[in-house]
């Protein structure tokens, strides 16, 4: 599942030969029309289904049922891989949303992500100055101009706490900056 694919910028990184089907959960109507175009232009028709919904369970679960992915037996462990790229910074309830997404992973499934995070100024690679700048940017309207993006989330920690993991790979990038990132994956226990 591709969570918050926007216009489909990540589709070029998916391997059409190994993917059976991708379900893209995109809540923005403005992005959906562009996503449909990208899917067509990249040759993903028949292998990429756009779901007009958000990542939150109350929106996502009905969309997955409509696709026939969640059956009457209630089993929600349906995805081999869930990809989140710069989207978890914008969901209203990140901890609950991530927990809901993790429940959709099959045992051994991967939760892959690339996300903005809070500057970890208390670590050796963090920066108190950058953390102060980050805080000021947030105070002076970052969220309202950047589609709800919250730069002050500890997203990797939220993912860590959302499930039982048997393996993980994390890389922190530009830790010293006011807009640091973390990317990597967690493999669900099982």
Feature map (PLM): residue ranges:
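Short conserved AdoMet
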Residues: 15-19, 92, 106
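Class I SAM-dependent methyltransferase SAM/SAH-binding core
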Residues: 1-66
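C-terminal alpha-helical "lid/dimerization" subdomain adjacent to the S-adenosyl-L-methionine
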Residues: 114-183
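A short SAM/SAH-binding and catalytic strip from SAM-dependent methyltransferases
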Residues: 77-93
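A short acidic, Gly/Pro-enriched loop at the edge of an enzyme's catalytic core
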Residues: 60-82
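C-terminal lobe and adjacent flexible extensions of AdoMet/dcAdoMet transferase-like proteins
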Residues: 182-190
């Amino acid at each position: 599942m591709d969570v918050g694919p926007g216009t489909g910028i990540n589709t070029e990184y998916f391997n059409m030969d190994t993917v059976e089907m991708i379900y893209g959960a995109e809540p923005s109507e403005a992005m959906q029309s562009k996503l449909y175009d990208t899917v067509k232009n990249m040759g993903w028709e028949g292998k990429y289904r756009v779901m007009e919904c958000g990542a939150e369970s109350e929106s996502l679960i009905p969309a997955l049922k409509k696709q026939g992915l969640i059956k009457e037996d209630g089993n929600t462990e349906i995805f081999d891989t869930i990809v989140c790229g710069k989207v978890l910074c914008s969901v209203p309830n990140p901890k609950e949303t991530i927990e809901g997404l993790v429940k959709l992973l099959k045992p051994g499934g991967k939760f892959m992500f690339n996300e903005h995070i809070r500057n970890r100024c208390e670590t050796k690679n963090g920066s108190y100055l950058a953390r102060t700048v980050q805080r000021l940017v947030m105070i002076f309207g970052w969220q309202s101009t950047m589609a709800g993006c919250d730069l002050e989330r500890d997203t990797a920690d939220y993912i860590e706490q959302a499930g039982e993991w048997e393996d993980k790979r994390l890389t922190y990038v530009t830790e010293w900056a006011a807009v640091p990132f973390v990317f990597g994956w967690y493999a669900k226990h099982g």
